[in-house]
Amino acid sequence: MESAGLEQLLRELLLPDTERIRRATEQLQIVLRAPAALPALCDLLASAADPQIRQFAAVLTRRRLNTRWRRLAAEQRESLKSLILTALQRETEHCVSLSLAQLSATIFRKEGLEAWPQLLQLLQHSTHSPHSPEREMGLLLLSVVVTSRPEAFQPHHRELLRLLNETLGEVGSPGLLFYSLRTLTTMAPYLSTEDVPLARMLVPKLIMAMQTLIPIDEAKACEALEALDELLESEVPVITPYLSEVLTFCLEVARNVALGNAIRIRILCCLTFLVKVKSKALLKNRLLPPLLHTLFPIVAAEPPPGQLDPEDQDSEEEELEIELMGETPKHFAVQVVDMLALHLPPEKLCPQLMPMLEEALRSESPYQRKAGLLVLAVLSDGAGDHIRQRLLPPLLQIVCKGLEDPSQVVRNAALFALGQFSENLQPHISSYSREVMPLLLAYLKSVPLGHTHHLAKACYALENFVENLGPKVQPYLPELMECMLQLLRNPSSPRAKELAVSALGAIATAAQASLLPYFPAIMEHLREFLLTGREDLQPVQIQSLETLGVLARAVGEPMRPLAEECCQLGLGLCDQVDDPDLRRCTYSLFAALSGLMGEGLAPHLEQITTLMLLSLRSTEGIVPQYDGSSSFLLFDDESDGEEEEELMDEDVEEEDDSEISGYSVENAFFDEKEDTCAAVGEISVNTSVAFLPYMESVFEEVFKLLECPHLNVRKAAHEALGQFCCALHKACQSCPSEPNTAALQAALARVVPSYMQAVNRERERQVVMAVLEALTGVLRSCGTLTLKPPGRLAELCGVLKAVLQRKTACQDTDEEEEEEDDDQAEYDAMLLEHAGEAIPALAAAAGGDSFAPFFAGFLPLLVCKTKQGCTVAEKSFAVGTLAETIQGLGAASAQFVSRLLPVLLSTAQEADPEVRSNAIFGMGVLAEHGGHPAQEHFPKLLGLLFPLLARERHDRVRDNICGALARLLMASPTRKPEPQVLAALLHALPLKEDLEEWVTIGRLFSFLYQSSPDQVIDVAPELLRICSLILADNKIPPDTKAALLLLLTFLAKQHTDSFQAALGSLPVDKAQELQAVLGLS
């Protein structure tokens, strides 16, 4: 077809007439298959009078060349390259230039710089041109081609950085500035150490360029700010010397109320990221005060007159969830404070933040008081330990006072803060149930009918607080259940019913068996919602599935008769309703049921795993974001007619995604993947051998999700892979076979290296913590098999050592920031604790002799955290890790006695009970396993522990002293326990808090029976007293009871008089019970 005829067809497509567009589309698809179509399109893109036609032709040419470039003859390719560059130089319309630049980028992706020297010449000539329009065209072309293949430009980085240093200074040309920043955005992740001096020169100019762009075009400025994000994230320290200037610029924009919300929010997102990656430098450069003084007024800003913040509105039509979801600068400023709490040591943040908080909370303005409560809420996330130890009573009092504030705005914030406190300040906050529960119940009852948004806030706080109460919920159970069941019985909105059903789950988690009297009524309501066909009740249906899963875990056995019905119901709903949230909750239900049914779930596993595989593989909800230039997607499928021909062609070229500027993902689909991973991991462990036929396919899909951009999905995938290893190990134990062993070894061979890689390279601390926890679980479950490949033990020790030395990617700081600072953010301390938990597991898996050389490397790293200047949390972690590792080392710990004992003796005198408790436990296990080197120090150890038992008031520490004394008595070289010590130890029983030490006490009873039973005549009354107290207690290990009864039977038979005299000291009912158990009545 002639270009004139093609032009007419394209014109038809631009008309506002659907029928003509349809016909023209059909014709065009036929025309474009002809060989003459490409020359006609090239003619139009270069010479059509109408810019819309030129742009349309450029887009269609690009889409054709995308898959057909290599089929063109060499002369045709050269001719096209020349024609496009000429057209680009002549073009005066921006939209056409952009399409031509993208067409050039498509060819460049195929050819590279070497095969297209004219492109490089044009870039060099145009970007240095004295004429502004030509320079702008050059920078536009540069930004597009660099984005299409950034690695190809790495050899030219210095030249490009010098160019950007010039162009970013041209504040009179906003176009130049924008394309320069786009180019820098793409280059930043590829910068090397050699590029740093030149790249740093750009930072002040970047700030000036942004200051120029913001007043001209806020939308373009938002896009250009990506350059700052990329430089902040860069592995080379480009921003650090200019951190103060960058922060000042960000704060100026953030506080400028004359600007639009979009640019202020975008700059607050930059600040959030800056805090995350440059927290140490912020403190070092004293930038925290100006940051806080800017953020607080933004958080406290009042909405326009007559309006409310989004989260304070009570509109059923546009239901906003309880989380802060408003798209206003206020909510993003709160997120910056949250990030500060997560990444700064609380000792540095709280003293600067608290005076501002106190002033806000005293203010007459409800929005100031609200700001104070919002900041308190997010502070509990990152500085939870600090608040628990030092500030909880006064801060909780402030929050409770907020629940009774005259302003609804403040009451809403107080409910949010209480919900966050309940989530982040466990277990301490639960001890305030007497103060909090009456307030919450009164608030719940005061919410007027129909005010579901206020009800949602009240339920959020109530759920989070109640969920962790355990037995403390019992006094409030009748009132709580009446409130919830009333909401379900009475006519109320679907949202109110959904909230009540959700709250029932939290109440069940706390109440456990105490919920049984209400179980029939709850099930009646849940059944009604689960079987409903009403569309408006679908959220209630989904919530009912989730609560059903919670009930299965909470009430246990009484749910077993309903398990099969629940399973069928879940599968049926997945079949009928296509909804990611419904699937997510159904999978959680299946996981809960697997705990009850075990291998009884086998008949449904094929259906369940088929659904889960679809969820793991699904790309639903992942939406390509197209570059603003590509308004012509009519012909996405214009090559369909040639599909068969292309399939025959071995040289089919890949689709070019250069139009796609990114992907947006709906969170519900990420949540679905995360919960699928969690559920399938749990099901694999609970169903064991029955899961084996599905293991391989599920494993492969979960493994792929380690590359997922969403951190919660990566975290869940790592956790599931660990559970698969544990499930395979369990299957090998119950059903040993070569294929099962091979499957376990193959899984470990992939999972363990992926864990090591994640610890070293993953940037998100939450993911690394989850990986370390999963690794610990795999080591405990699979033991020596985890370490099978040669060198694996050394590799794992190296990875854990890197965490303790703060050398992993998620702990990374600029070299300039590296300086000794005793304070650290609580999340950084938690990361070290997770590594610490893996060390004893590794010792136990490797065996003492193999692990001893590596322990010698860990020892100085742990001991240095017990010194005088260290925090309580650090000392507790270090001493706890040492003590647990001594157990893993066993007899091999003897060689370390001289280095360990001084540390344990000094920390046993600490003021903090947890540190003392860990140190005393450590002494006991060192006495038990340390052999002769430890026995030399027994008099010193007894000299410390014996008097300490009499004066110690903390239950857990007393229990650990009992455990340590028991170990000392059993390890005594004389094999004869000292009567005084034995009497004092037995007098201190029963254990109150650390019930695990009953195992040690049980071993002591066996030791006494075997080595010196006659010696226990003097302590017979104590033994009988202990026996009468623990006999009916289910928490005491059966072996411990059996050992004590054996000892008492010996006494009753061999020393009858002494035994009967001791029996007389007990209450009559207890004495009779004991005689019956011993068969003496």
Swiss-Prot record:
Transmembrane segments: none annotated. Its main location: cytoplasm. GO terms for molecular function: nuclear import signal receptor activity; nuclear localization sequence binding; small GTPase binding. InterPro entries: ARM-like, ARM-type_fold, HEAT_type_2, Importin-beta_N, Importin_beta, TOG. Gene3D superfamilies: Leucine-rich Repeat Variant. Keywords: Acetylation, Cytoplasm, Nucleus, Protein transport, Repeat, Transport. GO terms for cellular component: chromatin; cytoplasm; membrane; nucleus; protein-containing complex. Nuclear transport receptor that mediates nuclear import of proteins, such as histones, RPS3A, TNP2 and VDR. Serves as receptor for nuclear localization signals (NLS) in cargo substrates. Is thought to mediate docking of the importin/substrate complex to the nuclear pore complex (NPC) through binding to nucleoporin and the complex is subsequently translocated through the pore by an energy requiring, Ran-dependent mechanism. Found in a cytosolic complex with ASF1 (ASF1A or ASF1B) and histones H3 and H4. This is Importin-4.
